[in-house]
UniProtKB/Swiss-Prot annotation:
Subcellular location: Cell inner membrane
Pfam families from the UniProt entry: FAD_binding_2, Succ_DH_flav_C
Residues forming the catalytic site: H257, R273
GO molecular function (one): electron transfer activity
Domain of life: Bacteria
GO biological process, one term: anaerobic respiration
Assembly with partners or alone: Part of an enzyme complex containing three subunits: a flavoprotein (frdA), an iron-sulfur protein (frdB), and diheme cytochrome b (frdC).
Name recorded for this polypeptide: Fumarate reductase flavoprotein subunit
Organism: Helicobacter pylori (strain J99 / ATCC 700824) (Campylobacter pylori J99)
């Protein structure tokens, strides 16, 4: 039996895994990265719109800082995130942007002078300062107070992945693709690597290491309609679950992106709306301002997805053979802007829908017939233009994943996790656009360093016989799938699982349907034990791969559905129509799912409390819908009083905003990442002879004083 030894084993070749591999090589570790696909084809490349970091370079970004990015992230999560992790993230993100620039990412840059833009559906002129010429530009994204999303046109993930992959190769990281991790090797609650199948030869071998980091991405493919690539099936997270020790966090927290192309499901980046694109119904009316007057199309993703579906349910969706949808109008931005800044979107729309989204030519007035005249809140009907893109919400992102602490350590010692595969818990119950492509790079930096330190100190304490036993177990399972007498077809089971998840565990959830979904998923899981693969070869066998992955996917589907059924509240992307309020009194916690015994047919669910008294920002009104639509935590007022007292006392002592922040909620972070981020406006403050950072303490005070002005719950 073949066994390969290394210091650091990283499973997953996207942004998180590759950035962590660089951290390991920088400490002199023998590092191996295993990937299902050539690493430059990892799903990180599909990210289009941009990466959030508070640089405050451009006109619409002025005044931005870590505090505002932190506030947006916490509110966006519907107070479900780990606030210490959010602080680590927002502090490191500006450094990550500049590191990526030094590695060759061609960030779109500021050009001095006037530039046209579309804001709130209106054409405006933005004037950039001469002294900011050449600095990194940011665009607007949903749920943010400032234009913070740095970008490379609409191919941000692609350029980032290529730059990080090149840097990993420069450091001579051993990258091996076409490798599929089947199971983790573990003993005495410690992880020592993984059993791996070569997708080309079918050979099953072991990779034994001092430390293992999982970075295999999300689990979107358990749904039928998703923007995720075929490799995003959650098998890595499921393998962690199957150890019986590692736990999954917040699996019911599944994000549905508002603008997926109909019918293909390919993502139409949030940058379309961030740059000024608008959503229209079948009558050509812009409808989002009627639902969300402040943020409109740039409300958080969970909010926009719900509003689109609500509008369709009212009968305002455009008809198509693939179901009702609404229109995304970016022709309003002008052909020059679309062809320059949204060229991938244009190419996708033309290739997969036969639509040129820059085309503003009037196509027909048929859609205006029968348009209501007594609903002025939705605006005036207008003739459909050729360039409007058909879109509707589809599964997009996994907020849940393998539960880790802020250092990336899982419940299984020696196993770390980073990126979308992890529940680090940066995103809580809703992720902000632009934080996804940020997270794997930032997590790869932070967790990669902690992981490398672990590998430097750890020892391999497992004998060859135990490793070979893990290999044999996987070999026996492959033999069983190929030669058992079962009659079940893997594709029939997999397809029905996806349909159940779409129909009953989607954007809107309800107890009875969740119970039905749970029952059917249990039946499918039982049937999956009798799958027999028709193609009998071990090598180059996609049917065999689908067979062993489908059982893992069903375990994840059960975790998602059981978590959704038990959580009797609505929080972020988890919307229970039978429990419409967010309930901080009962549900300010994190769901933990485990599978301690292979004999179980359901996950074990427990909860991890979020401590209000340690939060920098206590749970409050999120800014969408009715202000009273949540049940406050009983300790909220006590924590608010503590926060306010601390801010006022430290302000009197002349402390700056960063010193105030550390007093409110200390957090651990490597010194090189915790160092203060410098911005161009800091130099202007120095030039005026003012105390650096002190001018922002009042912003922090306003943020925590809002409850005294009646801006939280009623």
């Amino acid at each position: 039996m073949k066994i390969t030894y290394c210091d650091a084993l990283i499973i997953g070749g996207g942004l998180a895994g590759l950035r962590a591999s660089i951290a390991c090589k920088q400490k002199g570790l023998n590092t191996i990265v295993l990937s299902l696909v050539p690493v430059r084809r990892s799903h990180s490349a599909a990210a289009q719109g941009g990466m959030q970091a508070s640089l405050a370079n451009a006109k619409k970004s002025e005044g931005d800082n870590e505090d505002l990015h932190f506030l947006d992230t916490v509110k966006g999560s519907d107070w479900g995130c780990d606030q210490q992790v959010a602080r680590m993230f927002v502090t490191t993100a500006p450094k990550a942007i500049r590191e990526l620039a030094s590695w060759g990412v061609p960030w779109t840059r500021i050009k001095k002078g006037d530039r046209p833009a579309v804001v709130n559906g209106e054409h405006v002129i933005i004037t950039e300062r001469d002294d900011r010429h050449g600095y990194i530009l940011s665009r607007d994204f949903g749920g943010t107070k400032k234009w913070r999303t740095c970008f490379t046109a609409d191919a941000t993930g692609h350029t980032m992945l290529y730059a990080v992959a090149n840097e990993a190769l420069h450091h001579k990281v051993d990258i091996q693709d076409r490798k599929d991790m089947l199971a983790f090797i573990h003993h005495d609650n410690k992880c020592y690597g993984a059993v791996v199948r070569d997708l080309i030869t079918g050979e099953i071998s072991a990779y034994v290491s001092k430390g293992t980091l999982l970075a295999t991405g999300g689990y979107g493919r358990v749904y039928k309609h998703t923007t995720n690539a075929v490799i995003c099936d959650g098998a890595g997270a499921a393998s962690a679950l199957e150890t019986g020790v590692a736990k999954l966090g917040n699996m019911e927290a599944v994000q549905f992106h508002p603008t997926a192309l109909v019918p293909s499901g390919i993502l139409m980046t949030e940058g379309c709306r961030g740059d000024g694109g608008v959503l229209r119904d079948k009558f050509g009316r812009r409808f989002m301002p009627a639902y969300e007057p402040e943020k409109k199309e740039l409300a958080s993703r969970d909010v926009v997805s719900r509003r689109i579906l609500e509008h369709i349910q009212k009968g305002y969706g455009a008809k198509s053979p693939y179901g009702d949808h609404v229109w995304l109008d970016i022709a309003i931005l002008g052909r020059n802007h679309v062809e320059k800044n949204l060229r991938d979107v244009r190419d996708i729309a033309m290739t997969f829908a036969g639509i040129d989204p820059a085309d503003s030519e009037e196509q027909t007035k048929d859609n205006m017939q029968g348009a209501p005249t007594n609903e002025p809140e939705y605006g005036q009907a207008m003739a459909k233009q050729k360039g409007w893109i058909p879109i509707k919400p589809m599964q997009h992102y996994s907020m849940g994943g393998v539960r880790t602490n802020p250092k990336g350590e899982t419940h299984l010692k020696g196993l770390f996790c980073a990126g979308e595969a992890a529940c680090w818990d940066l995103h809580g119950f809703n992720r902000l656009g632009g934080n996804s492509v940020s997270e794997p790079v930032v997590a790869g930096m932070i967790i990669g360093d902690y992981f490398a330190s672990h590998c430097l100190e750890a020892q391999i304490e497992i004998n060859t016989q135990k490793v070979e036993a893990f290999i044999k177990e996987s070999q026996d399972y492959m033999h069983f799938l190929l030669h058992n007498e079962g009659k079940e077809d893997v594709y029939e089971i997999r397809e029905r699982m996806k349909e159940v998840m779409d129909e009953k565990v989607g954007v809107f959830r309800e107890g009875k349907k969740l119970e039905e979904a749970l029952k059917e998923l249990q039946e499918l899981y039982a049937r999956s034990k009798n799958i027999c693969v028709k193609n009998k070869v071990l090598h180059n066998n996609p049917e065999l791969e689908d067979a062993y992955r489908t059982k893992k996917m069903l375990k994840l589907a059960l975790c998602i559905t059981q978590g959704a059924l038990l959580r009797t509240e609505s929080r972020g992307a988890h919307t229970r129509i039978d429990y419409p309020k967010r309930d901080d009194e009962k549900w300010l916690n994190r769901t933990l799912a485990s599978w301690p015994s292979a004999e179980q047919d359901m996950p074990t669910i427990e909860y991890e409390e979020l401590d209000v008294m340690k939060m920098e920002i206590s749970p409050d009104f999120r800014g969408y819908g009715k202000k009273g639509n949540f049940i406050p935590h009983p300790k909220k007022e006590e924590r608010d009083a503590e926060i306010l007292k601390t801010i006022l006392e430290l302000e009197k002592l002349g402390k700056d905003r960063i010193e105030v922040q550390h007093a409110l909620m200390p957090f651990e972070l490597q010194e090189k990442y915790k160092a203060r981020n410098m911005r161009l406006e800091d130099e202007e403050v120095r030039a005026r002879g003012e105390h650096l950072y002190s001018f922002n303490v009042h912003d922090l005070l306003d943020q925590h004083n809002a409850n005294l002005k009646g801006e939280h719950h009623e």
